[in-house]
């Protein structure tokens, strides 16, 4: 597959090829590279409440909130648990004075609801990435979130799809 870089600088990125995620590395500025699909080397380990690659080790609680993101290269914990869990989905009442959806009151944090109703969690594998897909319900809304780790890239992606049916409630993902 031919991958074009429209930027004026070299870049590396993930691309989808035949339904699988591949890594296109060092594509020249305003140039192209040929990318061949690569099968997973199995270096990403996903278990019920953890995921790990050569860069990060993630640990989740029973509601799939992050309890730990350990950076293996820096040899340090990324999250400060004294301030809360990571990727904790929170809903807040939202009754603005003038402009619905444009104005958040400064007292919105007074009514917080945790989105902890996990209906399903499963390991997912997609080419050069793997992770955990979590389905949550909140009242009549559904949130599907996949947390991805990559074989050759030092990043964590939080891919989130929200079917939000609530009125006067806002949703956020909190990280300490």
Residue ranges and their predicted role:
Residues 1-173:
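Catalytic and substrate-binding regions of extracellular carbohydrate-active enzymes
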């Amino acid at each position: 597959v031919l991958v074009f870089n429209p930027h004026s600088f070299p870049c590396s990125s993930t691309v989808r090829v035949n339904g699988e995620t591949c890594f296109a590395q060092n594509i020249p500025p305003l140039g192209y590279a040929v990318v061949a699909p690569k099968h997973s080397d199995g270096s990403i380990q996903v278990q019920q409440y953890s995921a790990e690659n050569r860069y990060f080790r993630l640990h989740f609680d029973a509601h799939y909130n992050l309890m730990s993101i350990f950076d293996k290269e820096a040899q340090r914990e990324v999250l400060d648990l004294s301030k809360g869990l990571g990727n904790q989905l929170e809903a807040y009442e939202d009754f603005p004075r003038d402009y619905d959806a444009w104005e958040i009151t400064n007292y919105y944090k007074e009514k917080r609801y945790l989105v902890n109703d996990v209906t399903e969690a499963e390991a997912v594998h997609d080419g050069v990435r793997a992770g955990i897909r979590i389905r949550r319900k909140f009242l009549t809304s559904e949130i599907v979130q996949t947390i991805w780790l990559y074989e050759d890239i030092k990043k964590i992606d939080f891919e989130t799809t929200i079917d939000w049916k609530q009125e006067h409630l806002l949703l956020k993902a909190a990280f300490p």
